[in-house]
Amino acid sequence: MEFSPRAAELTTLLESRISNFYTNFQVDEIGRVVSVGDGIARVYGLNEIQAGEMVEFASGVKGIALNLENENVGIVVFGSDTAIKEGDLVKRTGSIVDVPAGKAMLGRVVDALGVPIDGRGALSDHERRRVEVKAPGIIERKSVHEPMQTGLKAVDSLVPIGRGQRELIIGDRQTGKTAIAIDTILNQKQMNSRSTSESETLYCVYVAIGQKRSTVAQLVQILSEANAMEYSILVAATASDPAPLQFLAPYSGCAMGEYFRDNGMHALIIYDDLSKQAVAYRQMSLLLRRPPGREAFPGDVFYLHSRLLERAAKRSDQTGAGSLTALPVIETQAGDVSAYIPTNVIPITDGQICSETELFYRGIRPAINVGLSVSRVGSAAQLKTMKQVCGSSKLELAQYREVAALAQFGSDLDAATQALLNRGARLTEVPKQPQYAPLPIEKQILVIYAAVNGFCDRMPLDRISQYERAILKSIKTELLQSLLEKGGLTNERKMEPDTFLKECALPYTI
């Protein structure tokens, strides 16, 4: 029996099938790994890829395209390259590196890609920001005029820092560079407790580059015990992490800090340290076969740091009046500040705090060399009272260092020289401070006022710290508050502190 389907039925059936037919094609440009090793993958076939674009390997590991060549693309791998092998597929993502940002990040420890590593679960509500963005333009900026207190007498009096400034901390290893940065974070606890609005609070971002994991864990413990983690974010690219993550970590931390800057708030970011970032970038560049320059660093190592530090800024009132203050750390070798990386970063920043091994071992801690340290814009942000009190102390310290060198050779000194040596020794003693014990600015003013105005001149040097403790123990709150008033110290206002300091000095003078 012959089967002859009706034409109408076939037509209807085909039409219904065609109308229900749906394809959701996703077109991805893919390439294949030609070679891989030392964290660098050479990939063939990604002809349309853009510089700085993220890619994904078959193993799930991410990477970023840095070298675009005729035959292949040089990709640095964010993670272990052991799971990647020759012939693996590589897929373009069409996006550049971004990280989470927002207040949900506060109190968390994350890696260079913003993934939490503190074992406290995923991040809650947050936005994502690109790690590489242009720095604010000239019109969007405003000159630095608000103080950023560190809680260290040596810094707040002689090398003041303002919100939106970039102040370099430079020195040999084991001279207390990180201690200065940590004390600054701890000091914001008491500063934030006084703030009356969100626009006064200072949030902190600490970026650990190439440090030991034990050091980072110790830092988390110190900040947690001081309740400082509640306003801090830690970005850690430790020594065991691949070089690309150590290179990326400062930019990731900066993107997190920019969230506060761009939303009318204030943030402080510490890069500890940029020398290790430069070394990681040198390793990547040499493996990508880029031509080496001085000290084998690539030619664009200046741009590596300048584009990062230019993102620290004080925004104008029209753009929200937020700020991002940067404290980059650079490690020198045997005090050589004329090496390549230090000479690159010093002109980018607005001043430097120099720490020295010799001062550290002499017991002057923080070991800050006041002669070499400078703040190019911070004095505009300094409190008027502090400016009045320590105005002449930097000159006196410079004269003291000059005379002290000569006084070693001869004992016949006139009375004026003897008085200068005596005062200089006391001005050197007063800025000494124990670690993790930042002082509020009004207490700093009072202690420095006592030294500058001669209340310590007749005291033995070993009694000055006792005198300082006695001042801080018995001071009245009203007197401290009067030191913060905008008018500065007038002759009438000086009478009360003078009387108080004279009474406190009596038990300690010879």
Curated annotation (Swiss-Prot):
Q: Which GO terms describe its cellular component?
A: mitochondrial inner membrane; proton-transporting ATP synthase complex
Q: Which residues form a coiled coil?
A: none
Q: Which InterPro entries match?
A: ATP_synth_asu-like_sf, ATP_synth_asu_C, ATP_synth_asu_C_sf, ATP_synth_F1_a_nt-bd_dom, ATP_synth_F1_asu, ATPase_a/bsu_AS, ATPase_F1/V1/A1_a/bsu_N, ATPase_F1/V1/A1_a/bsu_N_sf
Q: Which residues form the signal peptide?
A: none
Keywords associated with the record = ATP synthesis, ATP-binding, CF(1), Hydrogen ion transport, Ion transport, Membrane, Mitochondrion, Mitochondrion inner membrane, Nucleotide-binding, Transport
Gene name?
Answer: ATPA
Intracellular or extracellular location(s): Mitochondrion; Mitochondrion inner membrane
Tell me, in one coarse class, where this protein mainly resides.
Answer: mitochondrion
> Which PROSITE patterns did the record assign?
ATPASE_ALPHA_BETA
Q: What does the record give under GO molecular function?
A: ATP binding; proton-transporting ATP synthase activity, rotational mechanism
Q: Which Pfam families match?
A: ATP-synt_ab (PF00006), ATP-synt_ab_C (PF00306), ATP-synt_ab_N (PF02874)
List the PANTHER family hit by this protein, alphabetically: ATP SYNTHASE SUBUNIT ALPHA, MITOCHONDRIAL (PTHR48082:SF2)
Protein name per UniProt: ATP synthase subunit alpha, mitochondrial
Site (Required for activity): which residue positions?
Answer: S373
Q: What does this protein do?
A: Mitochondrial membrane ATP synthase (F(1)F(0) ATP synthase or Complex V) produces ATP from ADP in the presence of a proton gradient across the membrane which is generated by electron transport complexes of the respiratory chain. F-type ATPases consist of two structural domains, F(1) - containing the extramembraneous catalytic core, and F(0) - containing the membrane proton channel, linked together by a central stalk and a peripheral stalk. During catalysis, ATP synthesis in the catalytic domain of F(1) is coupled via a rotary mechanism of the central stalk subunits to proton translocation.
Give the record's subunit note. Answer: F-type ATPases have 2 components, CF(1) - the catalytic core - and CF(0) - the membrane proton channel. CF(1) has five subunits: alpha(3), beta(3), gamma(1), delta(1), epsilon(1). CF(0) has three main subunits: a, b and c.
- The UniProt record gives the binding positions of ATP as G171, D172, R173, Q174, T175, G176, K177, T178
Provide the species name: Helianthus annuus (Common sunflower)
What is stated as this protein's family in its record?
Belongs to the ATPase alpha/beta chains family.
